[in-house]
Amino acid sequence: MSRSGARVERVPLARYTTLGVGGESEMWFVETHEQLAEAMSAPYRILGGGSNLVVSDSGVPERVLRLSGPLAERDLTPDPELSTPDLIVTGWVGGGVPLPGLIRALQKLGWSGLEGTVGIPGQVGGSVWMNAGTRFGEMFDGLHTIEIVTPDGVRQVTPDDLKWGYRQSGIPRGHVVSRVRLKLRPSTPEAVLAKMEHADQARKGQPKNKTPGCAFKNPGGVSAGKLIDEAGLKGTQVGNARIAPEHGNFIVNLGGATAADVHALLALIRERVGVPLELEYELWPEQLGG
């Protein structure tokens, strides 16, 4: 237990990533801004839902911060001062809230704005930090206010304050998205569900194994998956990691894969594809660049 009451444990990070790889590290489970400030007083990294992440087999030397308690709770009550008949602005949604559960809750309320992100794993904070999305929508489609914790304090910003874009929020690395307010449009549960099912149908070709998600960003509007397919790499395997036969831009853990296996596949893809590819994965530590 830390001075401010945060729970501190050494844990295998593989347990907390969707890929299921990663060595042991010191994890801080933070529930308050005070605990977050203490945890950020030494070198640290932020771990949300563990998607889009490949962690070294030896873990990382920094503290690993995970939002929990009140910072993983949601208040979807419309704010009476900010909401209008055509716009719903919610109470605060913690950065540690699981994104899939939030999307389901919004659908049941009949509130539209984030249904295009259906199927994305992870937590709200990390999804906002990287502006996670699909071709049907992204996190910044439904954001009103973002609360960011930095080593210098807490500040609240709007999307207009940030230089956000495709798979990027403009929030500096190491700054923590602690809470957000959502901005949504009133609709019906049936209409929102229909949009979610349409997006889900388009994702049916994606693998169901343990995976971090898409490995590379689409270069210049061209599908990275298509480029990898054309290079003849679908199904290529190193150790227990494989480029998914269903979709070339996904790497899956067949069981017992290591980060080294995944890194080898990423390097092979970059070598064989004829255009520069920028990683969508985050690497801990940053070994491949890009």
UniProtKB/Swiss-Prot annotation:
Location in the cell: Cytoplasm
Keyword Cell wall biogenesis/degradation: yes
Cofactors that this protein relies on: FAD
BP GO annotations: cell division; cell wall organization; peptidoglycan biosynthetic process; regulation of cell shape
Catalytic activity: UDP-N-acetyl-alpha-D-muramate + NADP(+) = UDP-N-acetyl-3-O-(1-carboxyvinyl)-alpha-D-glucosamine + NADPH + H(+)
GO CC terms of this entry: cytosol
Enzyme nomenclature, EC number: 1.3.1.98
Stored PANTHER family: UDP-N-ACETYLENOLPYRUVOYLGLUCOSAMINE REDUCTASE
Purpose: Cell wall formation.
Protein known as: UDP-N-acetylenolpyruvoylglucosamine reductase
